[in-house]
């Protein structure tokens, strides 16, 4: 019998193998076609009597290509392994998650044998490779629900001692860690083994030990199970299982561990019990288990660590991190030590493997399981294609994309068809040599069928793609058309609205002026007697009419200017009218009434002229009626102005007007004189007016002068007015002068006025002078007034001399400078008018002081350098010289005299002073470049962003300024002297007054700052120290969406911390930035106690964008609360009105616990802030620093923040804003480089975000801050961990010593 040769046998076996491969490929092709058609019967025929591996192979294909009904059918009918791995080591659950098929993921998770904790080749669980956040959340939610339900059922069975149910649950817990026998219960603080041991249940203890309970697991109180029993049998049982576990070769290696270990502290204390946790490759320890959620004492990233274990000491091991971090740990037993050593070693090895480059499977092969990486890559590229878009871009109102699911499905089918086609072609090439082989025809048939199917699939895909493109194109065109129409209409509407408002205001102003003119004319005509009555003759002419309708001479621009200058200039007024405007009009604004003159020099002028007998009752009645009418007009005018946020217009008469009045006739009666003075709150007249007034007739009666003075709050006259008044005749009667003085609260006269008053005649009676002085609260006279008073004739009575007492200067005394470098305080006390001062002393004091002051131009109390925090008391009736800070100030505030720092404060100051290394260089005050950014239309870019969040806008770098939002937070620290001033003040109301001034001063730097600062990167930090003021500051970007920056600053006297969290939106006409975070201030006052203040910032807005003149406004209410005493302060930042009314204005009050006002606050946040007690004097709390022109409208303090000196650089972390390349490039004027660097940093940040979402990087957590609840207010806030300054000191010393230093756990973000 002949035996076949070995060659023939091998040839036959090879041929059979090829036929088998061909048959498998054909069956796979048939299976694909059945999956695509959804033919369940065909699938059943193909998988009938197939092995478990073949059915599992079909399951892998169906997950990628079949519908969910087909997958459920395979899972329920055929014997498959749902936890099997494919060629690329992916489970079916991994493939379903990578394909983004949530329906199939749900079907797999409901399978009883599924193990969702398995990891793939990249050491990732199934939920970590999900392509969408929704699918990832779904899978996580399922895990949590399953774990909770299983754990709840097991606890219930444990309490009931149902060992059968416990066995069933533990068997199903083999794959999923839903049950942890060593878990410490939150309520009892003990494990299952502790509870069973305390209950002396030996059977239950044995069951727990058999199923893996650890007898050396400590409870919340640090005790072992053996500590809860004295039964020797129970102790022996626990020890025996300990011995068995000790002798076991390979203890289980858990991924997460926690428990008590003894940690070496120092030679004095030795080992101390600490709670350790191992989670996500990080080993951390805490003082006890209760602190595990909040107070971490230290941690080591095992990626950078190594483990040291000496076999001679089986319970001791060391974990050594990078640098000097080293944990020397001692376990309770060798078993516990081995368990921890194995877990730590496994974590270190996993990190090392994760850092190795991935070696993919054979790329040349076209096995079925190679589809998963390709499909995952395709799906991932689709998912990451929109990574540059913000989250809010996905909520466009649209219908579902046509056939989206079918599109992805056909893509997978096409890939599998190509794979099968390659196999068939390869088989055909191998069988070409056998011409007569019938399999050749089968091969070509298969190729034909495959090509036909592939062609059909490609056509379907292209058709679906065309539909999608058509859909998106139509959607985009509609959006563009709507956006263009909206932008055009919005701009038109805004412009039309502005024009309508302007026309309305002009019409309303004209109506009011006309109404007042006719009212005055009607009142004058009503009182006009008949020609036969010689007691009062009133003549009207063109001059009277022109003067009657005076208001029409004012333009809107002039009216607005006067409104702004007078009504809202809180420090430009006197007599407690800080927020009111004095009615001020020129002499030609009303009817002029003159008295008859006994001098023949004066010639008549066109005016309202009368000839009257002032002694008659009718004349007096007419005078009273006219005075009443005029006062009514003034009151109505002032009310209207106030209601419209305006003020009464005032305008100084020109020289021509003065010259016209110089030659007024002398035959003018008392009524005319009364009417002129009554309705003319005069300002400083010019030379012509003074010259005209000098020639007034002397026969003015008493009543006329009295009325004139009652209604004329005069301002400072100029030289011409003084000269005119010097030649007043002496025949004025007592009554006239009395009436005049009652109505004229005069201000400081100038040199001309003083010279005029020196030559007043001596015939003035005592009564006139006394009444005049009663009604004229005068200010400090200037040099001219002093000269006039020195030459007063001796016939003046004592009452007349009393008028000079109000002109005496105010004594100024130096305030006490605080121990901290706070600025000098200046105060000028306002002295009330006194009617009983000694005339001689008052006059002499006025002369002596005015001689000195006459050399200086009278101006407001000047503030010295650093006077922004000074408590300056400004008198409404006084002016100080520029060097007034050298004089002493009489302060009503309660100051501590040179407060001595206690021991605790000194210690705090020393701790903070350590952080001042690197800040030895002088402060930078300017930039070397100019603001020559490329000019781009702001509206052209922003018009498509209306209604969106500003923080998610991507603007060109030319719209930025070379600062960061973190540095904007640091700009709040410019006026910290206010906090030092508050700290040294003993009065609680004055303390909160200075705190309020500090809160308002934070907005001073926002003026004209319309450019957008750079958005901080996640993890970016900024530090700033001020050695002269003794504080240090640190801020970190702890969140990116929404953007949140956590800040912390401290000095020896205070701690200031909070979060910069805003909600911003663009409304088309304006940007609105609304702060959300609360700011906390812990202030140490002179008694040593600490007070807590809190407040939230007000809304900032950039307006005027469409009109091309953007400006910054801050508005809203700020509530400052002292939680220690209950005192509060409310600041109201007035919004900018139409045409600039109320611009920058701040008003508020300090209230006691029973809501009683104690102090009033007013001023402007861009200039000065004042405080004033009710019915008391006001003090200057804060004044803005000088702001010279700088590039990008930056303040000198803001310019100093980004300075990077060689002394400072070694001390900074790699995340500091000063090291940011795009911001530095823009500061240097390299705008193209800044744009490219900005784009690079943003792409790098997006890439890290995607890696964190996919599980390739650990989740983000802030490095220097942690979220917590405030212990006093209960609000959420960011708690500083106090590690930054310690590590900074280590880094600086290492760099100065020439050593390398890596900041621990700090990301590379630049």
Swiss-Prot record:
Q: Which GO terms describe its molecular function?
A: 1-phosphatidylinositol binding; oxysterol binding; sterol binding; sterol transfer activity
Q: Which SMART domains match?
A: ANK (SM00248), PH (SM00233)
Ranges of Basic and acidic residues compositional bias?
A: 528-542, 591-604, 703-712, 735-744, 767-776, 824-833, 848-859, 876-889, 1235-1245
UniProt entry tagged with the keyword Metal-binding: no
Q: Where is this region: Disordered?
A: 1-20, 526-561, 574-904, 1228-1258
A single BP term in Gene Ontology: maintenance of cell polarity
Pfam family, any one? PH
Any single Gene Ontology cellular-component annotation: plasma membrane
Q: Which UniProt keywords apply?
A: ANK repeat, Lipid transport, Lipid-binding, Phosphoprotein, Repeat, Transport
Reading the lineage from the top rank, the first entry is Eukaryota
Compositional bias per record (Low complexity), positions renumbered to this chain: 1-14, 785-808
Q: How does it assemble?
A: Interacts with dil1.
What name has this protein been given in UniProt?
Oxysterol-binding protein homolog C2F12.05c
């Amino acid at each position: 019998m002949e035996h076949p040769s070995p060659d023939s046998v091998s040839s036959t076996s090879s041929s059979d193998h090829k036929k088998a491969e061909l048959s498998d490929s054909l069956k796979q092709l048939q299976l694909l076609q059945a999956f695509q058609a959804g033919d369940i019967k065909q699938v059943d025929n193909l998988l009938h009597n197939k092995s478990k591996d073949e059915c599992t192979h079909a399951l892998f294909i169906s997950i990628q290509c079949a519908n969910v009904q087909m997958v459920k059918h395979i899972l329920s009918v055929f014997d498959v392994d749902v936890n099997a791995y494919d060629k690329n080591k992916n489970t079916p659950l991994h493939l379903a998650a990578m394909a983004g098929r949530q329906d199939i993921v749900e079907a797999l998770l409901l399978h009883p044998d599924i193990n969702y904790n398995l990891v793939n080749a990249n050491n990732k669980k199934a939920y970590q490779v999900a392509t969408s956040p929704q699918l990832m959340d779904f899978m996580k939610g399922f895990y949590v629900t399953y774990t909770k339900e299983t754990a709840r059922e097991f606890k219930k069975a444990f309490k009931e001692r149902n060992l059968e149910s416990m066995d069933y649950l533990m068997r199903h817990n083999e794959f999923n860690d839903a049950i942890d026998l060593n878990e410490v219960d939150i309520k009892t603080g003990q494990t299952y083994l502790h509870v069973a041991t305390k209950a002396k249940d030996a059977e239950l203890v044995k069951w727990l030990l058999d199923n893996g309970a650890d007898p050396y697991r400590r409870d919340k109180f640090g005790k072992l199970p053996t500590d809860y029993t004295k039964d020797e049998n129970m102790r022996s049982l626990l020890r025996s299982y300990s011995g068995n576990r000790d002798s076991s070769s390979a203890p289980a290696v858990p991924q997460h561990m926690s428990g008590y270990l003894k940690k070496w502290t120092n030679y004095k204390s030795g080992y101390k019990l600490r709670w350790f946790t191992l989670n996500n490759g990080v080993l951390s320890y805490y003082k006890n288990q209760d602190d595990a959620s909040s107070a971490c004492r230290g941690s080591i990233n095992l990626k950078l660590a190594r483990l040291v274990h000496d076999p001679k000491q089986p319970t001791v091991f060391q974990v050594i991190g990078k640098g000097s971090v080293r944990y020397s740990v001692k376990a309770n037993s060798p078993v516990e030590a081995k368990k921890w050593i194995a877990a730590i070693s496994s974590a270190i090895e996993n990190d090392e493997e994760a850092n190795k480059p991935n070696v993919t499977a054979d790329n040349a092969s076209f096995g079925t399981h190679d589809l998963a990486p390709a499909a995952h890559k395709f799906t991932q590229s689709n998912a990451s294609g929109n990574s540059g878009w913000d989250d809010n871009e996905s909520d466009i109102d649209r219908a579902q994309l046509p056939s989206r699911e079918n599109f992805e499905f056909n893509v997978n089918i096409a890939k599998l068809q190509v794979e099968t086609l390659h196999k068939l072609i390869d088989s055909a090439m191998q069988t070409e040599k056998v011409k007569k082989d019938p399999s050749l025809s089968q091969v070509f048939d298969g190729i034909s069928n495959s090509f036909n199917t592939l062609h059909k699939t490609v056509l379907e895909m292209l058709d679906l793609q065309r539909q999608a493109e058509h859909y998106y194109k139509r959607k985009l065109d509609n959006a563009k058309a709507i956006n263009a129409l909206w932008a055009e209409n919005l701009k038109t509407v805004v412009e039309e609205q502005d024009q309508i408002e302007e026309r309305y205001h002009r019409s309303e102003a004209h109506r009011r002026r006309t109404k007042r003119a006719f009212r005055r004319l009607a009142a004058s005509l009503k009182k006009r007697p008949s020609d036969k009555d010689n007691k009062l003759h009133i003549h009207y002419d063109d001059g009277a009419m022109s003067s009657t309708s005076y208001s029409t001479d004012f333009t809107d621009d002039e009216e607005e200017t006067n409104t702004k200058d007078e009504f809202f200039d809180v420090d430009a007024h006197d007599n407690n009218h800080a927020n009111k405007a004095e009615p001020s009009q020129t002499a030609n604004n009303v009817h002029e009434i003159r008295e008859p003159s006994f001098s023949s020099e004066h010639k008549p002028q066109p005016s309202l002229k009368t000839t009257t007998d002032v002694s008659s009752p009718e004349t007096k009645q007419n005078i009273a009626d006219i005075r009443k009418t005029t006062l009514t007009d003034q009151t109505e005018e002032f009310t209207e102005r106030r209601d419209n946020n305006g003020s009464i217009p005032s305008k100084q008469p020109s020289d021509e007007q003065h010259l016209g009045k110089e030659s007024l006739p002398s035959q003018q009666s008392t009524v005319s004189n009364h009417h002129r003075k009554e309705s003319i709150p005069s300002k400083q007249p010019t030379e012509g007016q003074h010259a005209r007034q000098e020639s007034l007739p002397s026969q003015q009666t008493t009543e006329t002068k009295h009325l004139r003075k009652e209604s004329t709050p005069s301002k400072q006259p100029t030289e011409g007015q003084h000269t005119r008044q010097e030649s007043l005749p002496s025949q004025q009667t007592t009554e006239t002068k009395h009436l005049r003085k009652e109505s004229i609260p005069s201000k400081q006269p100038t040199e001309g006025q003083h010279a005029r008053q020196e030559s007043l005649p001596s015939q003035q009676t005592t009564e006139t002078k006394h009444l005049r002085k009663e009604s004229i609260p005068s200010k400090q006279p200037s040099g001219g007034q002093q000269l006039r008073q020195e030459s007063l004739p001796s016939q003046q009575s004592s009452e007349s001399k009393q008028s000079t007492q109000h002109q005496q200067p105010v004594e100024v005394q130096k305030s006490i400078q605080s121990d901290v470098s706070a600025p000098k305080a200046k105060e000028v006390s306002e002295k009330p008018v006194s009617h009983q001062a000694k005339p001689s002393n008052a006059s002499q004091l006025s002369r002596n002081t005015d001689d000195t002051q006459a050399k200086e131009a009278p101006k407001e109390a000047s503030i010295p350098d650093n006077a922004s925090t000074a408590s300056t008391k400004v008198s409404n009736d006084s002016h100080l010289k520029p060097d007034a800070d050298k004089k002493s100030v009489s302060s009503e505030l309660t100051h501590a005299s040179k407060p001595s720092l206690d021991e605790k404060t000194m210690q705090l100051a020393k701790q903070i002073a350590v952080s001042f290394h690197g800040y030895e260089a002088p402060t930078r005050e300017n930039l070397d470049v100019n603001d020559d950014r490329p000019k781009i239309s702001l509206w052209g870019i922003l018009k498509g962003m209306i209604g969106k969040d500003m923080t998610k806008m991507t603007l060109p770098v030319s719209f930025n300024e070379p600062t960061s939002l973190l540095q904007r937070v640091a700009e709040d620290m410019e006026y910290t002297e206010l906090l030092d001033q508050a700290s040294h003040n003993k009065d609680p109301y004055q303390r909160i007054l200075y705190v309020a001034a500090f809160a308002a001063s934070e907005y001073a730097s926002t003026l004209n700052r319309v450019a957008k600062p750079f958005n901080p990167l996640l993890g970016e930090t900024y530090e700033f120290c001020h050695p002269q003021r003794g504080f240090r500051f640190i801020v970190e970007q702890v969140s990116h969406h929404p953007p949140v920056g956590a800040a912390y600053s401290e000095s020896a006297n205070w701690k200031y911390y909070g979060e910069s969290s805003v909600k911003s939106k663009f409304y088309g006409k304006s940007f609105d930035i609304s702060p959300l975070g609360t700011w906390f201030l812990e202030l140490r006052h002179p008694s040593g106690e600490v007070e807590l203040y809190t407040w939230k910032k007000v809304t900032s807005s950039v307006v005027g964008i469409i009109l091309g003149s953007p400006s910054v406004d801050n508005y809203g209410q700020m509530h400052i609360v002292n939680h220690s005493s209950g005192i509060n302060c409310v600041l109201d930042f007035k919004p900018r009105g139409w045409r600039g009314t109320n611009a920058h204005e701040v008003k508020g009050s300090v209230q006691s616990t029973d809501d009683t006002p104690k102090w009033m606050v007013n001023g402007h946040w861009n200039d000065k802030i004042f405080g004033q007690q009710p019915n008391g004097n006001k003090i200057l709390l804060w004044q803005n620093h000088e702001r010279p022109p700088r590039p990008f409208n930056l303040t000198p303090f803001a310019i100093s923040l980004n300075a990077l000196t060689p002394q400072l650089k070694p001390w900074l972390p790699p995340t500091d804003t000063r090291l940011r390349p795009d911001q530095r490039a823009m500061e240097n004027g390299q705008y193209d480089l800044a744009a490219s660097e900005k784009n690079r940093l943003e792409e790098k940040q997006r890439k890290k975000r995607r890696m964190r979402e996919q599980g390739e990087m650990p989740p983000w957590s802030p490095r220097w801050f942690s979220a917590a609840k405030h212990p006093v207010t209960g609000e959420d806030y960011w708690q500083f961990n106090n590690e930054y300054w310690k590590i900074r000191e280590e880094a600086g010393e290492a760099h100065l010593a020439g050593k390398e230093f890596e900041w621990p756990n700090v990301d590379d973000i630049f």
